[in-house]
């Protein structure tokens, strides 16, 4: 009987894995899986770019439990964020460090040891010798087992909470944004991810934004964007030709306006897909946190002009017909906010565009964020307290503090789950 049970479990796992059809490719505005079927991203962000440099929440919930919650909503992808500092440590400091040491470095000896013991209790596969990147491997493996794809996102260079104009991670050449190390880190991660059968794509950089200090070597403009992003894309493609490459825009990734029409980016430079041998691997990504929107037509119109019009291949003004994925958006997880203009508009409009998306954020709490340990995703009591700089909603955690259940079942069942179903109805 025991043998039969084990055999059944192995069979179920293999069936789940066999349902994944990587690698992906792009044709015009569509993303296709390896069988040629259209694939629409419908998933959530799982942060792993904080000071501990492993995916959040493992002291509260097993990897399998968190993945199963996403799978239970019908989601098909996880946007897994990482910092370049993780790779810098591996390549410049003699190799990766253990999870235990990383926790102690970030939280101090007492709290770091305490949280590590909690992690081991909930995730016994994480040992005293387990390194940070091995935890990323574990998350990827569990997602593969449960039928979810992995989209890596380079969220930041120096591990910390993102984003502001003064955090040193804003733009090429900023205090911590070493361009050479950034490109090296991207190459390393996509090379490492070759062993993940469910790895399909990477975002080159999260939320490029104007730095507080001017850097004459890397002026904040589209010309610099073109040079650095296309160079990075070429290096990523050379390191892993199978990976889709997501290009983010300016102003916290809220605009890619000149890209669909191949407008002049300065000095006659234009982004043209035809210039790239790997054009079938390029995707655009945008973020939106206009949570105070009062008009769906205004919100959707702004998104369209910001870059979603790249999906309109019938418009003769569109030179670069490309997929566009909304890789970040989020709203307060309570009993009513899912009904407001912002949430309801995106829930309807994005599926109507047959566009992909990943919501911010699965996390219910953080090991440490902005100096506060075990910070709850809804530390603010009022809506105004939940809004940080530049209208970024920071009370968008889908899970409760202990990652054991949904923070608001209404927001999930009548909000995000409906959006998943609308996006994937075929």
What kind of feature is each model-predicted range?
Residues 19, 34-39, 277-279:
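A generic structural signal for short, non-catalytic loop/turn and secondary-structure boundary residues
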Residues 16, 161-162, 295, 385, ...:
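The N-terminal extracellular segments of secreted preproproteins, especially immediately downstream
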Residues 20-24:
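Short loop/turn motifs at secondary-structure junctions and domain boundaries
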Residues 1-19:
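Fungal secretory targeting signals
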Residues 26-269:
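Active-site mouth of glycoside hydrolases
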Residues 336-426:
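Aromatic-rich peripheral "rim/lid" segments of glycoside hydrolase catalytic domains that contact
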Residues 128-148, 228, 235-236, 243-246, ...:
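Extended, compositionally biased low-complexity polar/Lys-Gly-rich tracts
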Residues 173-176, 180-201, 205-356, 364, ...:
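Extracellular glycoside hydrolase catalytic/binding regions
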